[in-house]
Swiss-Prot record:
<dbReference type="InterPro" id="IPR037124">
    <property type="entry name" value="Chaperonin_GroES_sf"/>
</dbReference>
<dbReference type="InterPro" id="IPR018369">
    <property type="entry name" value="Chaprnonin_Cpn10_CS"/>
</dbReference>
<dbReference type="GO" id="GO:0051082">
    <property type="term" value="F:unfolded protein binding"/>
</dbReference>
<keyword id="KW-0143">Chaperone</keyword>
<dbReference type="GO" id="GO:0046872">
    <property type="term" value="F:metal ion binding"/>
</dbReference>
<keyword id="KW-0963">Cytoplasm</keyword>
<dbReference type="GO" id="GO:0005737">
    <property type="term" value="C:cytoplasm"/>
</dbReference>
<comment type="subunit">
    <text>Heptamer of 7 subunits arranged in a ring. Interacts with the chaperonin GroEL.</text>
</comment>
<dbReference type="GO" id="GO:0005524">
    <property type="term" value="F:ATP binding"/>
</dbReference>
<dbReference type="GO" id="GO:0051087">
    <property type="term" value="F:protein-folding chaperone binding"/>
</dbReference>
<comment type="function">
    <text>Together with the chaperonin GroEL, plays an essential role in assisting protein folding. The GroEL-GroES system forms a nano-cage that allows encapsulation of the non-native substrate proteins and provides a physical environment optimized to promote and accelerate protein folding. GroES binds to the apical surface of the GroEL ring, thereby capping the opening of the GroEL channel.</text>
</comment>
<protein>
    <recommendedName>
        <fullName>Co-chaperonin GroES</fullName>
    </recommendedName>
</protein>
<dbReference type="InterPro" id="IPR020818">
    <property type="entry name" value="Chaperonin_GroES"/>
</dbReference>
<dbReference type="GO" id="GO:0044183">
    <property type="term" value="F:protein folding chaperone"/>
</dbReference>
<dbReference type="Pfam" id="PF00166">
    <property type="entry name" value="Cpn10"/>
</dbReference>
<comment type="similarity">
    <text>Belongs to the GroES chaperonin family.</text>
</comment>
<dbReference type="GO" id="GO:0051085">
    <property type="term" value="P:chaperone cofactor-dependent protein refolding"/>
</dbReference>
Length: 89
């Protein structure tokens, strides 16, 4: 994949949603919660006012409505601004 986010944006691959509950109940796709955790795949160069803190390979937590979902080569990703990321874990 050859994609480079611009400015202060990052490309994140969301973690897989849970397939079943702790008690063993299988969760259908329509009822799955959107994951709030993912891996940073690529980062932009930042802006003159804001340096990029994130780097490729970081695992991050982000807000429920952060970014824009896209699909590349059959995989789902989210492009978001660095300040939409809540924490590095």
């Amino acid at each position: 994949m050859n994609i480079k986010p611009l400015a202060d944006r990052v490309l994140v691959k969301p973690a897989a949603a849970e397939e079943k509950t702790v008690s063993g109940i299988i969760i259908p796709d329509s009822a799955k919660e959107k994951p709030l955790k993912g891996e940073v795949i690529a980062v932009g160069n930042g802006t003159k006012d804001e340096e990029m803190v994130l780097k490729a390979g970081d695992t991050v937590l982000y807000g429920k409505y952060a970014g824009t979902e896209i699909e590349l080569e059959g995989e789902k990703y989210i492009i978001m601004r660095q300040n939409d990321v809540l924490a590095i874990i």
